[in-house]
């Protein structure tokens, strides 16, 4: 079942690639708002075909309400963002191009308070509002189309399945990989900062972010499925805790 969703994520990237402008010059590498909306619709269509999605009305409704509350308190209160829940026990959530956020069921179980859960959702909302994925694609303008596409796929997959990301990254050059990871680490720091502002604006306890990072650090220490340090698209968790 999980494999089905990973394939859908890859197909979502394929949709993205088919609608990307040429990456030859910087100005044409930026994705327009209309293109993002189109991509988001395609992603949701494919997600809705998956049997890995939890469709419980109460849980999904709760996530939607929480998400809307955080969006209203974010840097772009009018932004339309769609949420879905992945039937996966690992602690994770990920933002995708087109205003789509996936949340693993394991995140709900690992969150001790609503503020902890909200801190993760606000972080992903920040990724979307700060246009981190489209900015990444623009930053890769000098890379070959194939390398850029593979990195885009890998970075999305890394948020849901590190092992799959490792395989995909093998198809991209080492230089492009390192440059992209440096870029995404900066994105993570920015998403932390903006996300905490959103959390505070929405009336949640910002200490929830610190508490969740502590939980995440413990999970990484004892989880055999954690990605190697050089493939992590997030800053070292201890550094993120100290930054809060």
Q: Model-derived features: where do they sit?
A:
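Aromatic-capped interface at the extracytoplasmic side
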Residues: 166, 179-184
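Phosphoinositide system proteins, centered on phosphoinositide phosphatases
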Residues: 163-169
């Amino acid at each position: 079942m999980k494999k089905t969703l990973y394939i859908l994520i890859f197909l979502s990237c394929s949709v993205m690639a088919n609608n990307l402008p040429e990456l030859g010059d910087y100005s044409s590498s930026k994705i327009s708002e209309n293109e993002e909306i189109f991509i988001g619709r395609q992603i949701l269509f494919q997600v809705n075909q998956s049997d890995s999605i939890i469709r419980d009305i109460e849980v999904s409704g709760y996530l939607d309400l929480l998400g809307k509350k955080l969006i209203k308190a974010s840097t772009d209160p009018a932004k339309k963002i769609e949420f879905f829940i992945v039937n996966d026990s690992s602690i994770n959530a990920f933002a995708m191009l087109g205003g789509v956020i996936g949340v693993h069921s394991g995140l709900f179980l690992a969150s001790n308070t609503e503020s902890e859960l909200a801190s993760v959702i606000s972080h992903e909302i920040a990724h979307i509002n700060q246009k981190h994925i489209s900015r990444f694609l623009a930053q890769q303008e000098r890379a070959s189309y194939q390398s850029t596409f593979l990195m885009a796929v890998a970075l999305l997959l890394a948020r849901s399945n590190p092992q799959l990301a490792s395989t995909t990254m093998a198809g991209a050059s080492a230089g492009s990989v390192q440059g992209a990871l440096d870029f995404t680490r900066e994105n993570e720091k920015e998403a932390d900062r903006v996300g905490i502002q959103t959390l505070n604006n929405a009336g949640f306890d910002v200490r929830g972010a610190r508490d969740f990072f502590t939980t995440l650090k413990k999970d990484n220490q004892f989880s055999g499925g954690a990605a190697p340090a050089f493939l992590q698209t997030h800053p070292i968790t201890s550094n993120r805790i100290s930054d809060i």
